[in-house]
Amino acid sequence: MSLMLEPNPTQIKEERIYAEMGLTDEEFAMVEKILGRLPNYTETGLFSVMWSEHCSYKNSKPVLRKFPTTGERVLQGPGEGAGIVDIGDNQAVVFKMESHNHPSAIEPYQGAATGVGGIIRDVFSMGARPVALLNSLRFGELQSPRVKYLFEEVVAGIAGYGNCIGIPTVGGEVQFDPCYEGNPLVNAMCVGLINHEDIKKGQAHGAGNTVMYVGASTGRDGIHGATFASEELSESSEAKRPAVQVGDPFMEKLLIEACLELIQSDALVGIQDMGAAGLTSSSAEMASKAGMGIEMYLDDVPQRETGMTPYEMMLSESQERMLIVVKKGREQEIVDLFEKYGLAAVTMGKVTEDKMLRLFHKGEMVAEVPADALAEEAPIYHKPSQEAAYFAEFQQMKMETPKVENYKETLFALLQQPTIASKEWVYDQYDYQVRTSTVVTPGSDAAVVRVRGTEKGLAMTTDCNSRYIYLDPEMGGKIAVAEAARNIVCSGGEPLAITDCLNFGNPEKPEIFWQIEKSVDGMSEACRTLQTPVIGGNVSMYNERSGEAVYPTPTVGMVGLVHDLKHVTTQEFKQAGDLVYIIGETKAEFGGSELQKMLHGKIFGQSPSIDLDVELKRQKQVLAAIQAGLVQSAHDVAEGGLAVAISESAIGANGLGATVKLDGEATAALFAESQSRFVITVKRENKEAFEKAVEAIQVGEVTNTNEVTIHNEENEVLLTANVDEMRKAWKGAIPCLLK
């Protein structure tokens, strides 16, 4: 590979070799202007990865600026490895979500595993100890053998990495829709805890300070991974397996412990993960953020393959590597510290004052580029945006209630839809109890992890109903944030902030860019109303296969603060005789619903609507009632409507059922997906206090009959279902489809 002669600057220009690396003609002309000369092969490589959408957000920056990113608890917003939010008592929570979609489509096990590894490094590079992992996954329909393979391997990859490294995977979501068949989405989220004084930044301050490389050695895996993530998948993508990195969770476990010990040392100046674009992004970004330059000697890079060129070393995305800056003269302490963990720490450069990134190899300077040009000065594009053709058509459709003959059969069929069915097959492969801090395990509205040494907990969830967002990006964007907050509140937490993972098709298509703009508008409005700022995130574009885009899927990862663990609330019924309440009104809203998809095989019409002020009021009332000790169980009403929510609360309990009376047209009462609704149970003696605190309607009570019976307002039975049979259908659906 490396014995081939690299093309010279003139050949790069004349033969348009830069275009193969992902640069446009205009961008190459900009590079020429910045340097005042033609770039060589290595320099062209540096610009091509740093100016890719994946690293520069050149197509999405104008949209991302709409997000609210500040708040009284926000200690670090977007721009560093991960965002940080204050949780009181000198402690803070650090969290971020990232995508690993393209690699997972091609090499699902390693693609998913290294996605987990990368997001963990983003969190501990801030100085935090990772305490929990979540994920948000999208696949095609499980009837397809290829989808089964991708699903099984992605879950195995997440489990393999998370379990080995000893961080519990506590929650997440999995949804299935035909549009993800060729392009699955794998979004991984990591949550960590930190004391305020331990917060570190990825900045290279102090001229003369030493640049060191720590962790695993560099190979040829993942070269141009960032560029690969910035183009559409095609048949030829299979050939890009080398662009998928290979992870080693045991190496990463050692790296976490070594870095967390390093962070206690005053020798450390700055630290950054070598993620997308490897050594290039970590060095250029650390220099640029500090207003400094960096010189690096590439002969000193630990290499696990022979004859690597500067281009290959700079663009490799080998895993489990960090770049650190330490005070001059303190290098040996760092070497000794890492040696204790069996890890390499080598000096490979120094911080300079002139803002240049200079690379040397075999005694020659092989690249000289302004650090800011790579990190900050990528061109920004305001892409044309055009309302999707389908949108007006869907908006004009009048709301129709699907025809349902047999309510019980329909409920059982919904419980067996893979998007609604139990995800136990998934999370049983994850060790969600390791570190013994998990208070609420997977399967409820949000996971809860205790904050050791305090009475507090962290509630966390990932949410996004991409069908709603496809039908109406702005409304759907509001709903994604609101549903995440609703899940946090149902678990007894106060929503704090979000991280987002914006998964979309090709932004060069005006209709796709319109989806991006509108959904971000909706999310931003919801974040402002619910006071949950965006503290970081990730953009994943070009999620298309053969020109067909996935649904717009801006996933929301939210963390909330449980002020006292005695407030922790779960969705399952607690005891017979408790009263069942519903909060929120039900309308005949079926656009994008599970029922619509099940009956028609497609989605159409208007998405459910949401009033954010009403949402906020209800969330505040529910949280106050939970904190006052008035609530036995709480569950948000989502996919499948009230019938599914009530059934899930019964399935999670032991031997309990419920008798409930619902007003209005039966199909809507049972299965509509109207927003801002909760199913709450309350002890009989708390009835008066609860009704004073919360606007809710009592609809029935919890029974010990092991049956769910739902009546209409005339008291006619709409359905009676045995809870054991429902549980069997709900739990057995995914294993059955995988056989």
Curated annotation (Swiss-Prot):
One of the protein's GO biological processes: 'de novo' IMP biosynthetic process
Top EC group: ligase
Binding annotation for Mg(2+) 2: 122, 273
Keyword Repressor: no
Residues at which substrate binds: 99-102, 121, 245, 317-319, 540
Coiled-coil annotated spans: none
Recorded GO MF terms: ATP binding; magnesium ion binding; phosphoribosylformylglycinamidine synthase activity
Active site residues per record: 54, 100
Positions of Mg(2+) 1 binding: 98, 538
Enzyme Commission identifier(s): 6.3.5.3
Compartment(s) of residence: Cytoplasm
Reactions this protein catalyses: N(2)-formyl-N(1)-(5-phospho-beta-D-ribosyl)glycinamide + L-glutamine + ATP + H2O = 2-formamido-N(1)-(5-O-phospho-beta-D-ribosyl)acetamidine + L-glutamate + ADP + phosphate + H(+)
Taxonomy, superkingdom: Bacteria
Similarity annotation: Belongs to the FGAMS family.
Function: Part of the phosphoribosylformylglycinamidine synthase complex involved in the purines biosynthetic pathway. Catalyzes the ATP-dependent conversion of formylglycinamide ribonucleotide (FGAR) and glutamine to yield formylglycinamidine ribonucleotide (FGAM) and glutamate. The FGAM synthase complex is composed of three subunits. PurQ produces an ammonia molecule by converting glutamine to glutamate. PurL transfers the ammonia molecule to FGAR to form FGAM in an ATP-dependent manner.
PANTHER family according to UniProt: PHOSPHORIBOSYLFORMYLGLYCINAMIDINE SYNTHASE SUBUNIT PURL
HAMAP family, per database record: PurL_2
Protein name as annotated: Phosphoribosylformylglycinamidine synthase subunit PurL
Gene: purL
